[in-house]
Amino acid sequence: MQQPHIPVMLNEMLKFLAPKAGESYLDCTFGAGGYSKALLENCDCYVTALDRDPNVIKKAEEIKHNYKDRFDFVETNFGNCFAKLESKKFDGIVLDLGVSSMQLDIPDRGFSFLHDGPLDMRMSGQGLSAEEFINTAEEKDLADVIYKYGDETFSRRIAKKIVEVRKAARIDSTGKLADIVHSCIGFRKGKIDPATKTFQAIRIYINNELGELEQFLANVKNILKKDGRLVVVSFHSLEDRIVKNFFKENSEKPVARSKYAKEDIMLNPDKWLKIITNKAEIPSDKEISLNVRARSAKLRAAKKI
């Protein structure tokens, strides 16, 4: 059964994005439209939303019907959105990284081990599928992906078992892959399902999620107005590290070459961000109790200066 979509850290997103009437905002990860709708309801602002998943278009059309010219939707991944935005600039930009609840809850999408379905995991429906990767990749490559993107200690054991099983029969469903992982790692009381990290790792790899994030951040300066705010919600330590380092590298205070040097002689003259979250914001205990998917979320925000 598909669960109702609950936007993660919605109040915190609105707090740090601080929308104002007449301003324009970019929702880079539309999903079920939770952030876009909240922004449009908050004040008389304008929202452009992006998503590479064609399955969200119907939801986008519903919001377009209700908010008319205040809302636009562009079917694209955010890493390659710049040409399609046609030189638009925004007063605020928000990214809610990772997989959406809609994708997790539809078995045919193949994102979740909780529902048996085709082993797909492609957000756009194009390119290499998880099934193709699982059944053709070298054992070492499987282990590397599961370890790098899932931080899975038992990655080699899992990769070895995958190769062993696929020799007898193709691994073509989420249930089969989950069973393989479960056979390698026992369940521990109070811990997450043993298959969680492996599924996460394969999904991140298949959709080039970290590459998309890095590509977007490298170009975001060009579409953010002065004093515009950038808010990023991440769900994985690798995502959060990329965002944290990007904010730090572009917002460090000017450093003089020596204590006698003039202030305009700096090691970092190109800083353009001011961090407005001293450390990553995390969901409240109440939110986690209402939406377990929020448990690993971290929010960081910065302003263009």
Curated annotation (Swiss-Prot):
Localization, UniProt: Cytoplasm
Q: What is its main location?
A: cytoplasm
Q: What GO biological process terms does the UniProt entry carry, in alphabetical order? A: rRNA base methylation
> Which named protein is this?
Ribosomal RNA small subunit methyltransferase H
Q: Which NCBIfam families match?
A: 16S rRNA (cytosine(1402)-N(4))-methyltransferase RsmH
Q: From the UniProt record, report the name of the gene that encodes this protein.
A: rsmH
| Pfam family membership, one | Methyltransf_5
Q: InterPro entries, per this entry?
A: RsmH, SAM-dep_MeTrfase_MraW_recog, SAM-dependent_MTases_sf
Give the CC-aspect GO terms: cytoplasm
Which positions are annotated as binding S-adenosyl-L-methionine? G33, G34, Y35, D51, F82, D96, Q103
The protein's job, in short, is:
Specifically methylates the N4 position of cytidine in position 1402 (C1402) of 16S rRNA.
Q: Which organism is it from?
A: Rickettsia bellii (strain OSU 85-389)
Q: Which E.C. number(s) belong to this protein?
A: 2.1.1.199
List GO molecular-function terms, semicolon-separated. rRNA (cytosine-N4-)-methyltransferase activity
Q: Can the keyword Heme be found in this entry's annotation? A: no
The cross-references to Gene3D superfamilies, in alphabetical order and at most eight, read: Putative methyltransferase TM0872, insert domain, Vaccinia Virus protein VP39
Q: Which reaction does it catalyse?
A: cytidine(1402) in 16S rRNA + S-adenosyl-L-methionine = N(4)-methylcytidine(1402) in 16S rRNA + S-adenosyl-L-homocysteine + H(+)
UniProt keyword terms in alphabetical order: Cytoplasm, Methyltransferase, rRNA processing, S-adenosyl-L-methionine, Transferase
What family classification does the UniProt entry report for this protein? Belongs to the methyltransferase superfamily. RsmH family.
Q: Does the record's keyword annotation contain rRNA processing?
A: yes
